């Protein structure tokens, strides 16, 4: 019996010595430091989900983006010349400063029915353009996402038939070239309107997130002994 105990304790001592000499292995599931240049930990970082309204505005703007190439290819003049054309009853712009998020959303919502009516003029003068129909396909979803983001949702009604007819009559001209330029200018102004609103809303959203992150920053307390 004593000899068996001696053998047991000798084996235990030898095993302990081997464990002290062996390099430490990470415990299964434990976090370890990555070697320099190893980016395997990046999959743990999740990207902030895109704002649904901003994402949809980008989709609509992607459709309108083709207008510049089409216009310059047809007329061989600079795209920004369209800003010089005066179009009555254009919706008010979305300013980048001194406007609350709610006011920006309301401004965007108010502009949609006006541009929907103006695009009928574009269809008449530029029947091959796909932009008016593509815009209408997304306009109802745009309204839903705008009102869903508002604190106090409001109802913006479409223009009445008499208002729409008056709007289109104000654009009419006997000059064919002028009518075509007016149609292209409407598309130019629509793009500018959506870009300004998207950028202003995105700026407000990032500012809101920045303030929320600062409010959640942990405070370290130091105690003196």
Swiss-Prot record:
Molecular function GO terms recorded: cytokine activity; growth factor activity; interleukin-6 receptor binding
Subunit architecture: Component of a hexamer of two molecules each of IL6, IL6R and IL6ST; first binds to IL6R to associate with the signaling subunit IL6ST.
UniProt keyword terms in alphabetical order: Acute phase, Cytokine, Glycoprotein, Growth factor, Secreted, Signal
Main localisation: secreted
Source species of the chain: Sparus aurata
Compartments where located: Secreted
Tissue note: Expressed in white muscle, skin, spleen, anterior intestine and stomach. Not expressed in brain, gill, head kidney, posterior intestine and adipose tissue.
Family in the record: Belongs to the IL-6 superfamily.
Glycosylated sites: 98
Induction: By LPS or Vibrio anguillarum infection.
Protein's name in the database: Interleukin-6
Coiled coil: none
Cleavable signal peptide: 1-24
GO cellular component: extracellular space
Any one GO BP annotation for this protein: regulation of glucagon secretion
């Amino acid at each position: 019996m004593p000899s068996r105990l001696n053998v047991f304790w000798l084996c235990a001592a030898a095993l302990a010595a081997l464990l002290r000499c062996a390099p430490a292995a990470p415990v299964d599931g434990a976090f370890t430091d990555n070697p320099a240049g190893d980016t395997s930990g990046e999959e743990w970082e999740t990207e902030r989900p895109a704002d649904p309204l901003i994402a949809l505005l980008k989709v609509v703007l992607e459709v309108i983006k083709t207008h510049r190439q089409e216009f310059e290819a047809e007329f061989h003049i600079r795209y920004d010349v369209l800003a010089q054309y005066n179009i009555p009853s254009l919706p008010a712009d979305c300013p980048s400063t001194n406007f609350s998020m709610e006011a920006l959303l309301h401004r965007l919502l108010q502009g949609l029915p006006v541009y929907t009516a103006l695009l009928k003029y574009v269809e008449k003068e530029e029947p091959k353009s796909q932009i008016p129909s593509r815009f209408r396909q997304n306009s109802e979803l745009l309204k839903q996402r705008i009102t869903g983001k508002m604190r106090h949702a409001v109802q913006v009604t479409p223009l009445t038939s008499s208002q729409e007819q008056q709007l289109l009559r104000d654009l009419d001209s006997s000059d064919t070239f002028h009518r075509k330029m007016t149609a292209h200018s409407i598309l130019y102004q629509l793009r500018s309107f959506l870009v300004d609103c998207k950028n202003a809303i995105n700026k407000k959203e990032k500012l809101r997130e920045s303030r929320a992150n600062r409010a959640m920053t942990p405070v370290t307390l130091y105690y003196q002994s």
